[in-house]
Amino acid sequence: MDQEQEFLQSLSGLRDQLLDVLKDYWIFSIPYSLGEVAIAGALAKSFKQQYGGPLAFLVDPAKMGVAQLFADQVDVAVPVPMHLLRNLNRRGFLSPETFRRGSVQDAYEIHGAKLNFVSLVTLRNQHPDRGLPVTDVFRFAMRLPWEAPLHPGRPDKEALEQAERIAASVGMEPGNSVILFPGNNTNLPAPSVFWKRVAKEAAAAGKRVFVNVSGAALLPDDLDVPGIPVELNDIPQAIALCEIAGRIVAGSNGFLMTALLTETRFGLDVILTDAFDPTASGRHYQPMPIRSGSLFLQAPEIKEDIDRPYREWEVPSSVDTESIAVDLVRAWSAGNGSPS
């Protein structure tokens, strides 16, 4: 038996094991990033209202924290490495046409049915009046009506208590602090000069400034951004700590989508850039329409439901980013930061 055959045999064994353990569950495989797990989690209640339970999610171990935010609706979350989940689909081990308990469904792309839903999302990003937003792609894959509502998740008591301990240990002023997230995962991070100016202006405005650099694959060249360092690796704790701080500034990514789909109210300033690296290595950047990073394009219903200070800022590579940083901080005192 060659290596390929051994791998296929292991995938078959994994599928059979999952189906045996979860034979009475609706099972959704979500082999993607934080935001995708959060969207599926936010639709879990609507799914169970439509089809009943119990409901199981298969997610990468690093994304289990997102599933925990929706523990009141997702009955069990099973950690399975992302590459195995993706190969279960790509190698034809899933049966998307069999929609019932005890059959694994992919909550986003159904390669086995020769459908690539990401193409619909790409069209949406390029032309906002065309294609489907990410949230509707999930509704379609989960066989929900277009009007199925998103239900926010929440950090549990343990995460809230741990966040309070962290906040006290680093001297965070509740409601008067800002956490900067200079890094990103696929979208190009804004340059360090932008982040330094945001930190400077925020401090001058009386904010306690914190800088998180953990959990990001892509970082600006110079990370000497003034601020108190914090490491936010646990997703529920990180969201709870952001709520204590009162505001964050970050590039468009799955963490922000996750945060928007929780019962929190901290302010969000989202940085949109004009390139991305699908390999997340920092060596293969490709240009992209700057608005494609807009969370409102990906989940337009959140613009109607949002109840927090929120702004999106376009920071293209060819402009004076320091002036944008100044405007960003000044906007905090200009109003409540209604969606833009």
Where are the model-predicted features located?
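A short acidic, often aromatic-flanked loop/helix-cap motif at beta-alpha or helix-coil junctions
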Residues: 80-101, 125, 155-160, 218, ...
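Conserved catalytic-core segment of nucleotide-activated headgroup transferases in glycan assembly
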Residues: 37-50, 185-212, 313
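Active-site and donor-binding regions of nucleotide-sugar-utilizing enzymes
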Residues: 2-129, 237-247, 255-258
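Nucleotide-sugar donor-binding patch of glycosyltransferase catalytic domains
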Residues: 260-340
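Donor-binding and catalytic core of enzymes assembling or modifying cell-surface/extracellular glycoconjugates
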Residues: 65, 190-276
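Mid-sequence helix-capping/hinge segment at a functional interface
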Residues: 116-189
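Active-site regions of enzymes building and remodeling cell-envelope glycoconjugates
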Residues: 70-80, 219-232, 284-299, 307-313
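Structural beta-sheet core signal
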Residues: 27-28, 56-57, 180, 211, ...
